[in-house]
Amino acid sequence: MMKLTTRCGSAAVDGLNEALLAKAAEAKLLRTNRVRADTTVVPANVAYPTDSGLLATAVRRIGTTAKRIQAAGGARRTTLRDRSRAAGKRAHAIAAKLRSGAALGADQTRAAVLNRTGELAGLAEAAAREAERLLANARQAVRRAKAKAAELAARGEHDAAAGRRRGRLVRAVNDLAKLLTATRQIVAQTRQRVHGHTPDGASRRVSLHDGDARPIAKGRLGKPVEFGQKAQVVDNDDGIVLDHSVEQGNPPDAPQLAPAVKRVIKRAGRTPRSVTADRGYGEAKVDQQLTELGVKHVVIPRKGKPSQARRAKEHRKAFRRTIKWRTGAEGRISYLNRGYGWDRTRIDGLAGTRIWTGHGVLAHNLVKISALAA
């Protein structure tokens, strides 16, 4: 089922969502008098990333992937030293230093941790360097295997066992190539941190298998930083999700609202009377864009200190009543998290997250619309 889901891609599930909303609009079940928007983080399927943990895992996976290549008949005479034990020892030493930080003092503990982390980066670099040679030889083996298969096909023959072995070899070679790219990136950002520089969060790698996941600081208690993709949800009075989108990293909220409302207008065939969102969207440009789209009431608190006129507007009874209704967007996101898989994507990458969240929205809207139609 997972292979079928990823093969169809996000376009298929997007089409299903569009068809469902179109059917609801045709049956006059899609209310757009009031709509609200909010953003959330869809966590990637990754453990909490640390430089030492990522490096130790990279060293171990390089060794296991190399063994897969050699077991499939590639680069059998190329030697690759297994550094996983040495990497594990250094990772455990870092954990021990952090546990004994109170006894050693903060400065001494930090120096010891950075020293061990630098050693781990060196081990990962050495493992990647050796694996590059093995990868080059394995690619030659793949070319030879494909040439042999072509010769057999020209004679009208077929070796099923060799084909399966070749498939395993190709998959292992591709996995090692991706792993080495990720390892080099993690080594580079670890070197930055060891030298006192903080890696750029927009490009920082936090996983070996999910290259699109990014650190996102939302300022939540208990979860100040989450790792995954940022999603926006737009729903109405009935709780139907009228629009959703997933973006990489932590883009600003404000520029996402007007395009979402445009899509809602296209689906419903009419303009929402009132649009509300939290203070993260509070910019004069957003109000102007929504007004130009035909929205009569834009109910979004402004960032910073408001002027006296703006303060008076935000204290009106209708404004405050709509703002109270807006808080239900957080409940909608919580409902998606608890019941429809938004608490963690099980498909890697940005495209995978879009597929996963799209299926969640489809199931959610089917329940809501069927209840309205009953």
At which residue positions do the language-model features occur?
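Anion-binding and metal-coordination hotspots
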Residues: M2-A374
